[in-house]
A protein has these predicted regions:
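Intracellular coupling helices
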Residues: 145-152
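Membrane-anchoring alpha-helices and their flanking helix-loop junctions
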Residues: 1-145, 166-200, 204-207, 211-225
Length: 225
């Protein structure tokens, strides 16, 4: 891991020699598996809809870590522009994959940059929502009741929001063309899954769910319907 400084006048990044950080497919697989299992331990998918949600999230992780440690497709496709704009950068170093820090002029190790720190907050917050949502949802399912306690008293879909926050965090930390393309598709998918879930809840709980739906926001805590 190397440090760099950025001349804000010339916009060139000065690097120490670095070893190419790609081609590590085993490391990519291990990281994708660790985060997928971490999410699985919190989410615990049971229904077909749960597995669709978890599968989409897992595919995002695979695409992300394949570029982070395997093959830098985004940097390869943008190499002409990147090399002409930042000729002093070793774009095959791991640090260079933190594109937001690189392009916006962060002066220091990108792992301590503002976007990297923000990504940890988003990822951590997302996993907390997924975990807290599961605790309440599982207890309600065991009693065949509507989940309205805990985090569900503030949000109707905390777990879907959690997945979106985790994906947002990874996108901020390590943006790639593939994950940028996948992100809006997956967000729309989660919104549709939430609507599908609500139709089933209305069918099962009737006016109780309609009252809950009218008083508790779906994804944004301070927004009311």
């Amino acid at each position: 891991m190397n440090l760099f400084t950025i001349d804000t006048t010339s916009r060139e990044v000065m690097y120490q020699p670095d070893i190419p950080a790609y081609g590590h497919w085993g490391l990519a697989a291990v990281n994708a598996a660790i985060f997928a299992l971490f999410a699985f331990s919190f989410f615990k998918p049971k229904t077909r809809r749960d597995w669709r949600s978890f599968g989409a999230f897992s595919s995002f992780l695979v695409a992300l870590f394949a570029e982070m440690y395997g093959f830098p497709l985004t940097i390869y496709l943008l190499s002409g522009w990147l090399e002409s704009r930042y000729p002093s950068v070793n774009w095959l170093s791991h640090d260079s994959g933190h594109l937001l820090e690189m392009l916006l002029g962060w002066r220091g190790n990108p792992h301590f940059g503002p976007f990297h720190i923000a990504s940890f907050v988003l990822i951590g917050g997302g996993f907390i929502l997924i975990a807290r949502g599961w605790d309440v949802l599982y207890a309600a399912q065991q009693r065949h009741e509507l989940a309205t306690a805990g985090i569900y008293a503030r949000l109707r879909h905390p777990q879907y929001l959690g997945f979106i926050l985790v994906m947002t965090g990874f996108l901020v930390q390590w943006p790639t063309l593939l994950t940028l393309a996948m992100y809006p598709v997956l967000v729309i998918m989660y919104l549709r899954l939430a609507k599908e879930e609500e139709r089933e809840a209305v069918h099962e709980f009737g006016s109780r769910y309609l009252d809950y739906q009218a008083s508790v926001p779906g994804f944004i805590p301070w927004r009311r319907r």
